[in-house]
Amino acid sequence: MSILAEKLSSILKRYDELTALLSSAEVISDIKKLTELSKEQSSIEEISVASKEYLSVLENIKENKELLEDKELSELAKEELKILEIKKSDLETAIKQLLIPKDPNDDKNIYLELRAGTGGDEAGIFVGDLFKAYCRYADLKKWKVEIVSSSENSVGGYKEIIALIKGKGVYSRLKFEAGTHRVQRVPETESQGRIHTSAITVAIMPEVDDVEVSINSSDLKIEVFRAGGHGGQCVNTTDSAVRITHLPTNISVSMQDEKSQHKNKDKALKILKARLYEKQIEEQQLANAKDRKEQVGSGDRSERIRTYNYPQNRLSEHRINLTLYSLEEIMLSGNLDEVINPLIAHAQSQFE
């Protein structure tokens, strides 16, 4: 038996063990254990189905090879073997994909944070442009986008946008967007036609619950103040705006989009938890990087990952040396799969 067949046999054995355990009175009466084992079985269900089919194909190949000695059945066995070998190859490809370790955050919703960096107003305008592209992509994927917080600049762009994106596999596809995005284009206000370079940062933070990130209330500094509008004008006569600082890490979140102090505090706390969880992920990735051939990217906000060159209609993905000359089409259609699919394929190849 090959190493792959042995591995698949052990997976099937575990699946059958879990089936038996889940029907036992002891497990049924223990909700925590029942949930834990159900989750484990669900995580190996797809690979178990493929394993059963693969082992069956191996058995059929073995039987047909034995029939090659039979003069009457040898031709039929040869034809059957051709079909079985193709099926075996296809199943091996699919199984290798299924055996790649799954990121536990892949099924989570995310907080998407875009922030203007170098380049002044032009950076803020690109924050809006890239956010629209993400919204179009979310629409294609049937995801829901909810703006949690936004801060506009004076020329119709944004200093910062934070949005909650909900749907199937959101984190699995957008996690590679974290980092610095550089844009090169001629601003509308540029009379000399000179190309300006500006940059924005993108953060992708999995939505987390209280179990995943526990915060001690004594570690929080909560400040309230009056919400300010454009140009410093006061938009609220009560102290509804909230700033929460996590003292051990000095991570701070301000929120003033809601009229209610309670709602602003609730939103700020959720984003703070997401940022703390993001920090945990970054630290874990750095620790794991030593054991990996190469990472697609660390997810560090300071890492320059992509350049959008409008005069050349060029999108350059620096982590995998991908260049596409369809920038405007991608931005207008929101079809980011042209970039995301190669990134996912590259990440998966590191486990092969």
UniProtKB/Swiss-Prot annotation:
The keyword Transport does not apply. Residues 289-306 have a biased composition (Basic and acidic residues). It is found in: Cytoplasm. The modification N5-methylglutamine is found at residue 233. GO terms for cellular component: cytoplasm. Pfam families: PCRF, RF-1. Methylated by PrmC. Methylation increases the termination efficiency of RF1. Signal peptide: none annotated. Keywords: Cytoplasm, Methylation, Protein biosynthesis. GO terms for molecular function: translation release factor activity, codon specific. Residues 288-309 are annotated as: Disordered. Gene3D superfamilies: 3.30.160.20, 3.30.70.1660, 6.10.140.1950. InterPro entries: PCRF (IPR005139), Pep_chain_release_fac_I (IPR000352), Pep_chain_release_fac_I_sf (IPR045853), Prokaryotic/Mito_RF (IPR050057), RF-1 (IPR004373). Belongs to the prokaryotic/mitochondrial release factor family. Peptide chain release factor 1 directs the termination of translation in response to the peptide chain termination codons UAG and UAA. HAMAP family: Rel_fac_1 (MF_00093). This is Peptide chain release factor 1. The lineage of its organism: Bacteria, Pseudomonadati, Campylobacterota, Epsilonproteobacteria, Campylobacterales.
